């Protein structure tokens, strides 16, 4: 989708089941002598594979290369459920959604933005139509929105945040980890394995399961739903 905007996109590939390729990212940054790379984009927690990536490691790669590129992170399936240190990791834009850790229906995009990213916005030349921080900031200053807001979801978000703060984020993270670890132990007991290549990559919000050769994953999902009333998602992309 970035290429649809006419942007020059350099993709650092990694095998499915692995996290963001830190060495490849640092190599690309070091090779950019003219410092033309504007931003590094990464997904913190990949839903299709159940893999979390080392965002702090990407920040270290940027710092080691002395590169001024910004760091944009998709945190849709991790923020409010797993530790996410926006300031400590030097993230410039983080994107979350109402439908994951904030426990609401889909419909809200929740963004965090750094002063550096806001400053870059002032000189950005790419046309924006659907979303523009300038529109948002101008409307917020007047106590409103540049569109008709989803009032019900916004009210629900306020309640969700109250719940998260009442429980305490450390307790929220511990709860998700405990439940995820229980799921992973069950997966191993069934003779299957998580799709993530190693334990340090395990997500605490989604576990993608690798079924044995000859096992029909879709049939397994259907059996769990019909016999046990349990809902599992089918694979996405290359793990479908």
Regions found by a protein language model. Name each.
Residues 16-19, 46-50, 79, 102, ...:
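Short, small-residue-enriched loops and turns at beta-alpha junctions
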Residues 1-30:
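PLP-dependent aspartate aminotransferase-fold enzymes
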Residues 11-12, 41-42, 71-75, 94-97, ...:
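General beta-strand structural signal in soluble alpha/beta enzymes
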Residues 87-99:
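Conserved active-site segment immediately N-terminal to the catalytic lysine
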Residues 99-185, 189:
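Active-site C-terminal subdomain of aminotransferase-like
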Residues 188, 192-240:
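Conserved C-terminal alpha-helix-loop-beta "cap" of PLP-dependent enzymes
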Residues 20-78:
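Active-site phosphate-binding strand-loop segment of PLP-dependent enzymes
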